[in-house]
Amino acid sequence: MVRISMSISYLWGMVASLFLMMPAYSADVPASPSPAPIEARNSVFINQHPDQFNSWKATSEQSERHDALAEDPYMVILWAGYPFSRDYNKPRGHAYAITDVRETLRTGAPKTAEDGPLPMACWSCKSPDVARLIQQEGEEGYFKGKWARGGPEITNDLGCADCHDTASPDFAQGKPALTLSRPYAERAMEAIGKPFDSASRFGQQSMVCGQCHVEYYFSGKDKAVKFPWDNGTKVEDMEKYYDAISFSDWTNTLSRAPMLKAQHPEYETWSVGIHGKNNVTCIDCHMPKVKNADGKLYTDHKIGNPFDNYGETCTNCHTQDKAAMQAVVAERKTAIQELKLKAEEQLVHAHFEAKAAWDAGATEADMQPILIDIRHAQWRWDLAVASHGIHMHAPDEGLRMLGTSLSKSAEARTKLVRLLAQKGVTGEVKLPDISTKEKAQQAIGLNMQQINAEKQDFLNTVVPQWDEQARKAGRLN
């Protein structure tokens, strides 16, 4: 028994020694490799993808600015109290993404990194530097602070790394390597049942564009970007979402209505149109395959009007000639434009009549249902017109939204007539002269001379400092 006991003790000692001598494999397991740093300088990729790069650079030819407020002064009134009443140009080439966000009056004239009216989130659709900063700082870190904080960091125009995994072997081999470079966009796609990784090639093509060409808002204390898609992507779905969280972008200074400002909801409106339902993607129409000088096909990155490349876009599906198709589009555009102006006219009257009701002594309780009608009416109008191509993407949906906008405005104005009568106001509420952008801005109390002077000083003094800091840090070529 003693010998057996000693043998067992000896064996246990040997086992213990072996355990002590074994290497600590768990400590030596290599950590998951960190992702390669995002390269935001677009010109780095010119040798890998020369045709794509040069066609992307050609978006600088789309240089003309169109002043939407000068064309339609009603919008100044609809956005009274919001930066869009100062300045709103129609979109132009991607090559101007940084220039335009710096130069618009909407971003103000900050003097320091902590100054200015807008948050960091206002850079989010402008540059691959955004993806770089999110990778470096995390989303929480990126969204902290004012827009001016990003000035020296976000300097490269919307480009390669916004849509492509430029560090991947696939990209180096000439493949698209599409990616969602904005994590909040990836979460939004998952919320509507469209996870990017399991989407088809066609689905991914539109999702990549849908990182920016969407409705979004700034959420929480850090004003982080979020898409309001929890209930769906139709105008009523997003309205329900916003109402449930009592969100408003601003308060109209005339009517005091809590307003929503639609951004550029092309993904949502395209999805419900004939092209979206048939999975004809943004790329099919706006970035067709074309041939280079050697006859090799490549994707044209000069994003533009499909009619500019009619033979490579529309004729893949349509048999009509170009003139016939242009006539169809023009007819739809005219129908949208006519209803748009009718909706705006009713909304403008509603805002001024609401102001008259407040001035006559109306109470919060009197006004609450009226202001909700105005909010809902303008939201429908704005979602329709902020999607610049809705006459092509989803004309029926555009007309439907504008029609419901008119209905909501009519409800608001009917209630206002009754309320004004109760307050002793029985005559028509006269509008001031708002026949031009300048007169409309004056009517809502904007000092445009001061606003423009402050902006020019910012462009002359602050912006050059941003660029110099970026060059010294190697963020610009």
Swiss-Prot record:
Cofactors named for this entry: Ca(2+); heme c
Principal subcellular localisation of the protein: periplasm
Residues that hold heme c 5 according to the record: 275, 314, 317-318
Positions of heme binding: 122, 125-126
Annotated GO biological process: anaerobic electron transport chain; nitrate assimilation
UniProt EC number: 1.7.2.2
Subcellular location(s) per record: Periplasm
Pathway terms, separated by semicolons: Nitrogen metabolism; nitrate reduction (assimilation)
Residues annotated to bind heme c 4: 282, 285-286, 393
Entry keywords, A to Z: Calcium, Electron transport, Heme, Iron, Metal-binding, Oxidoreductase, Periplasm, Signal, Transport
Binding site for heme c 3: 94, 209, 212-213
Region forming the signal peptide: 1-26
GO MF, one annotated term: calcium ion binding
Binding-site list for Ca(2+): 215-216, 261, 263
Function text: Catalyzes the reduction of nitrite to ammonia, consuming six electrons in the process.
The protein's name: Cytochrome c-552
Gene giving rise to this polypeptide: nrfA
